[in-house]
Amino acid sequence: MINIIKSLFAILFLCSCFSASANDECQSCHQKQTSDWKQSDHASSMALANKDTVLGDFSNVTATHFSQKAVFYKEKDAFLVDLTEQGTKKTYTVSYVFGFDPLQQYLIEVEEGKYQVFPFAWDSRPKNQGGQRWYANYANEDVKPNDRLHWLQPLQNWNGMCADCHSDNLKRNYNTE
C-alpha cells in the first residue's frame, strides 16, 4: 500500500513538472519516473495533431450520420475535415487528439481559442475487433444544431467542459465576448 501511495505521488509530481516547464528539471533527477510516465496512458491523453499522434484514417474517407457527412483528409501536415451538416459545408482543421485506445477523439478550434469536440471519433481497435472505423459520438441520435448535445454547443466545448480534468497547468484566456 505504501508503494502505491509513493507511486501516485511520483506520478502527480511528474505530471505537474511536465506541464509546468518544458525543460529537463524534473526529468534529470527522476529518470525512472519519467520513463514510467512516458509509457503511461496519461502521456498520450492529449497531444497536438500530427503524423505521430493522429490514428484516424485521413485518406479522403467519408463518414455519415443522419444529416452529417464528414470527409477526412490531409493537406501537407494538416489533418482536415469537410463537414456538411443540413446542406452547409465547412472545413475544419484538427488541432488536438484525445486518447488513443480504444478510441481517439479530435478537438477542432472553431474560433480563436475555442475548441469543440468533433462529432465523429476514430475506433482505434484492430479491424478484427470491430475497429479501424469512424463512428458518430451519439450513434442513435440525429443531433440538430439547437440540441445541447450538438458538437458546437457548450456541452461539447473543451474550454468549459473538458480542460479542467484533461490538461495540466491550465490558464483560462478564452473570452466569450
Tell me the role of every PLM-derived stretch:
Residues 1-7:
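Positively charged n-region of N-terminal signal peptides that target proteins for export
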Residues 18-22:
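Sec/Tat signal peptide C-region and signal peptidase I cleavage site
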Residues 52-74:
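Short Fe-S-cluster ligation motifs
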Residues 7-17:
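Bacterial N-terminal signal peptides
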Residues 39-49, 177:
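Short cysteine/histidine-rich metal-coordination sites, predominantly Zn2+-binding motifs
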Residues 23-35, 39, 159-172:
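Detector for the c-type heme attachment site
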Residues 44, 61, 65, 127, ...:
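Short secondary-structure junctions and interdomain/linker hinges
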Residues 75-177:
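Extended surface/linker regions that mediate inter-domain or inter-protein docking
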